[in-house]
Amino acid sequence: MLGRTLREVSSALKQGHITPTELCKKCLSLIKKTKYLNAYITVSEEVALKQAEESEKRYKQGQSLGDLDGIPVAVKDNFSTSGIETTCASNMLKGYLPPYNATVVQRLLDQGALLMGKTNLDEFAMGSGSTDGVFGPVKNPWTYSKQYRERSRQDAQEDSHWLITGGSSGGSAAAVAAFTCFAALGSDTGGSTRNPAAHCGTVGFKPSYGLVSRHGLIPLVNSMDVPGIFTRCVDDTAIVLGVLAGHDPKDSTTVNDPVKPTTLPSVPDVSGLCIGIPKEYLVPELSSEIRSLWSQAADLFEAEGARVIEVCLPHTCYSIVCYHVLCTSEVASNMARFDGLQYGHRSAVDMSSTEALYAATRQEGFNDVVKGRILSGNFFLLKENYENYFVKAQKVRRLIVNDFVNVFGSGVDVLLTPTTLTQAVPYLEFIKEDNRTRSAQDDIFTQAVNMAGLPAVNVPVALSSQGLPIGLQLIGRAFCDQQLLTVAKWFEKQVQFPVIQLQDLMDDGSLVPENGKLTSGSLTQ
């Protein structure tokens, strides 16, 4: 049951094949069994069981709230959850109990979803590995998969070479990949949903900016932050998006126009579409395996009758630097609220002045990565630097936006790109580089989309020669999220990404792949 799609489980609940309480207990048991992944910061067992009980009553009365009623979900720990600790994986917010739910959380709960817990992340979502939070790093479930152990000859008991999940929403990606929930919320500022989705073999969707409310998402970069969605298939993403999308009076950046339900065709058709391949994304650092899969994917579209053309995004080479300036500048502004007076941790050290209290509180509350980004942002915002850095970066951002406008205006429907440079790497290799360097490397294909406010989705396509997931990214026009997901659904059906084989789960029957074996895929190595 845990290996089924959200829609399939919803159907099973409606037909009485399983109850919400039984399903909830299965997921809670699996969360405990996979605790070594460190995917969750808080497991809300009592809350989830109570919600399951209420869902069960509705099913018995024939009053199901919809496809999400009784479905276990998880939420990244930078979304406010009423009465449930929300920490952003930081000492600054340890013990913080929000008095309200983020809008996206409330919309899930209003549809009967079961909140299994809050997932791990990089501190304040600043990172690309989910390794820098105060609660420790998240481990990629594929580290313990049969596919990886066999192809890389890793000892099942050897834990020194475990793989990162990507970040910053690595806990949500791991939670979905390990079957502890059927969907999870992440956040995406420069790729924080798509990056871990690629490394963990899940669908990771970033909606158009303004389609989904940010109210209750503890801000990192207000002009780029978007709630993201993790699921194990594109249809499930569409179901969740249909619940989350729409105007929110508490978030003035959300669209006012009514949003139609996100319904994808059962048999998607991409013939006649124009698929763009950005030539600037063919960088030397891109692994040969991903490069090959990218080319094969383009061939699949062409074989189906789509027109595949090379396109130019000329300002791509400036995007990482531009993103860094704008990101850290907004970080410095947003983090200023954590001062020991209004929000978060307050230093217990006896201080002689307010300034000293600020300094001690922030020294104790933030890790070095967060402090480093605050320092960078404050530098760019200094009066003598403002024009040369921040204002120029805003102008470059406009040029990057115009690049996408020109490409989509020329008749291109969707862009096809890599999501990451490489497959997931071992933790010991990842930490050889500092957080700033790693983030610049890992955001290379993803952050420009955030600056342009476009929808994008990672689709897992194949396993590498080492048995690890590789994903590709599809980018759509602004507010053409449904078209993008339709194309993604077609692509997903073509590649037939294999089911992860976690031996611990196979042994006790918690998860059995269809027909007891993996599905063969169209993209091979």
From Swiss-Prot:
It is found in: Mitochondrion. Coiled coil: none annotated. It catalyses: L-glutamyl-tRNA(Gln) + L-glutamine + ATP + H2O = L-glutaminyl-tRNA(Gln) + L-glutamate + ADP + phosphate + H(+). Gene3D superfamilies: Amidase signature (AS) domain. The keyword DNA-binding does not apply. Transmembrane segments: none annotated. One of its GO terms (molecular function) is glutaminyl-tRNA synthase (glutamine-hydrolyzing) activity. Its EC number is 6.3.5.7. GO terms for biological process: glutaminyl-tRNAGln biosynthesis via transamidation; mitochondrial translation; regulation of protein stability. Belongs to the amidase family. GatA subfamily. This is Glutamyl-tRNA(Gln) amidotransferase subunit A, mitochondrial. It comes from Rattus norvegicus (Rat). The lineage of its organism: Eukaryota, Metazoa, Chordata, Craniata, Vertebrata. The gene is Qrsl1.
